[in-house]
A protein has these predicted regions:
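ATP-dependent adenylation/nucleotidyltransferase module used to activate substrates
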Residues: 1-232, 236, 248-251, 260, ...
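AMP-forming adenylation/ATP pyrophosphatase catalytic core
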Residues: 7-14, 18-23, 42-50, 61, ...
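Ankyrin-repeat TPLH-centered helix-turn motif and closely related helix/turn capping elements
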Residues: 62-67, 72, 182, 293-306, ...
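PTP/DSP superfamily signal
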Residues: 70-74, 78-87, 102, 300, ...
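Glycine- and other small-residue-rich loops at beta-strand/loop junctions that grip anionic moieties
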Residues: 178, 243-247, 315
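Mid-to-C-terminal catalytic subdomains of enzymes
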Residues: 199, 203-210, 245, 249-308, ...
């Protein structure tokens, strides 16, 4: 897939998101093989691997998490790539800038790609002739082979672990937990990619998983974003592009590949492990698709081919671009209408707002409204004081994320960077910043 696609230019830094599962393990080993000198269509980018420890969100104890990391430790250095092990608790120390959509570099043309290949080969030839590092791309990675020798032995802060556990325990439904976990994981990987200079992120989503994801997202109200959620490339983040090179392989093909080439993998319990079939929308869609696949073997491929026909287009036309408002969580363009719009969603929003408004007493109508922020207090602290905090967050969310946020009783457990960015956007809209 990567040999045929010219999305990744020679010399680019690519971060491989490895979860320990079969698909992501197969992806890492195929990239390792593609970077070798014996490969027919040799890959020419610089790779790194990241592993996110999600044990706290799944209810694992410190001993269970340490056991998982002990299984991960010998696999990552064996790849020869720079690797990073991060805990999901680190989302509580992320800056609000992780939710900003940075400017995206223009896509290079066919001639630009060929020129980049020639320049890369010439540079490799000069390095080889000068007695520098070898020509094997996998052996000339400038970063060190590990992120931090103590990173595996140092557990995250206890306060952050408790905060993450409290956040996921407060979510009512498993569907909302799965979506929240995916969102926080994406934000953390995106921050690590930007911090270490990676311009691409590869995920191990297989054809089977993408077919399940397509049907799930349709049920979750994310139909407007299917091209980004299931496509080969996802450019919603701007400077970091998410690539899905495993989308042409089914889970069965991945299992055969891992068996034939002895690809190691690590089982890590997920938030829906041992959950019943009807516990969440994703679990229900997974059982539905896999059950159909056993009776009709073309089910997965048919759903997958449907996703290939989806076209990425801004909601307000090509002129909308990066200036259009984006969702605070999934970072897609907002797909909701205003309360006064002539749509079903607009009517529901207007009805909800009218129910929230309470009748104002006669004595209060004669009192002029005071300033939003009290004297001596910064604007950032009092901009949303007179508004419903839940409404301040909801106005910056897409339809699907709004539905999921209804399963979160309180906004207090959310990571600070999400609340800070929501407050900043509200102030910017009201003109206080």
């Amino acid at each position: 897939m990567l040999g045929k696609n010219r999305l990744i230019f020679p010399g680019e830094k690519v971060l491989l998101a490895w979860s320990g599962g079969p698909s992501s393990s197969s992806m890492v080993w195929q990239v390792l093989e593609g970077l070798s000198q014996d490969s027919a269509k040799r890959l020419r980018f610089v790779a790194g691997v990241i592993f996110v420890d999600e044990g706290a969100a799944c209810g694992q104890s410190l001993e269970e998490r340490a056991k998982t990391l002990a299984e991960v430790k010998p696999i990552l250095p064996a790849t020869g790539f720079p690797w990073h092990v991060v805990a999901l608790e680190e989302v509580f120390s992320l800056p609000p800038s992780v939710l900003w959509c940075s400017a995206q570099e223009p896509v290079g043309s066919e001639g630009a790609y060929k020129a980049a290949v020639d320049s890369f080969l010439q540079q490799q030839h000069v390095l080889g002739a000068g007695g520098g590092p070898g020509l094997i791309q996998g052996e000339e990675q400038p970063p060190p082979p590990t992120r931090d020798p103590q990173s595996l032995a140092r557990p995250p802060a206890t306060a952050q672990t408790e905060a993450l556990s409290q956040l996921f325990c407060s979510v009512r439904t498993l569907t909302a937990k799965e979506e929240l976990l995916q969102t926080l994981r994406t934000h953390l990987i995106l921050h690590m990619a930007r911090a270490h200079g990676y311009s691409k992120v590869m995920t191990g989503d297989s054809c089977t998983r993408l077919a399940i994801k397509l049907m799930t997202n349709l049920a979750l109200g994310r139909g407007a974003f299917l091209a980004w959620d299931t496509g080969f490339s996802d450019e919603r983040h701007g400077d970091v592009v998410v690539v899905r090179p495993m989308r042409d392989y089914t889970l069965k093909e991945v299992a055969f590949y891992n068996r034939l080439f002895s690809v190691p993998s690590v089982f890590t319990p997920a938030v829906d492990t041992k959950a019943p079939e009807k516990a969440s929308i994703r679990r229900l869609m997974e059982a539905f698709i896999l059950r159909l696949q056993t009776q009709f073997p073309s089910t997965v491929s048919t759903v997958y081919r449907t996703s290939e026909k989806l076209v990425k287009a801004p909601r307000d036309g090509p002129a909308a671009g990066d200036s259009s408002p984006r969702c605070l969580l999934c970072m897609c363009a907002l797909d909701v209408d205003a309360a006064d719009s002539a749509t079903a969603f607009g009517a529901q929003t207007a009805s909800r707002l009218s129910q929230r408004q309470s009748p104002t007493p006669l004595t209060e109508t004669r009192t002029p409204p005071g300033p939003c922020c009290s004297p001596g207090v910064g604007q950032a602290q009092g901009a949303c004081r007179r508004e419903d905090p839940q409404a301040c967050i909801e106005e910056h969310l897409c339809y699907s994320c709004r539905v999921n946020m209804k399963d979160l009783p309180s906004l207090d457990p959310l990571p600070p960077y999400i609340l800070a960015e929501a407050q900043l956007r509200t102030q910017r809209r009201s003109g206080t910043v």
